[in-house]
């Protein structure tokens, strides 16, 4: 599901809301999650999961084309851990 499909689906399920308003809401939610992660905060949505940032240390890597050793700088990556309710819903028969 893409962001556009999510917006359309939410607008269909909530006919009292205009699609442009739903788009603003979804965009604001994504922006707030992104801003929190950029600050190093953890975003927990109970039952759904938690977003956090993990640090990858600098390391030596290898260019697969040339085999040359290269330095890979440290970086921060987003991480998502599913919540218990989401896992249970996905694994029901």
Swiss-Prot record:
The keyword Ribonucleoprotein does not apply. Keywords: DNA recombination, DNA-binding, Transcription, Transcription regulation, Translation regulation. The keyword Nucleus does not apply. CDD domains: IHF_B. GO terms for molecular function: DNA binding; structural constituent of chromatin. It holds the Pfam family Bac_DNA_binding. Transmembrane segments: none annotated. One of its GO terms (cellular component) is chromosome. Disulfide bonds: none annotated. Signal peptide: none annotated. It comes from the Bacteria. One of its GO terms (biological process) is DNA recombination. This protein is one of the two subunits of integration host factor, a specific DNA-binding protein that functions in genetic recombination as well as in transcriptional and translational control. Heterodimer of an alpha and a beta chain. Belongs to the bacterial histone-like protein family. This is Integration host factor subunit beta. It comes from Rhodospirillum centenum (strain ATCC 51521 / SW). The gene is ihfB.
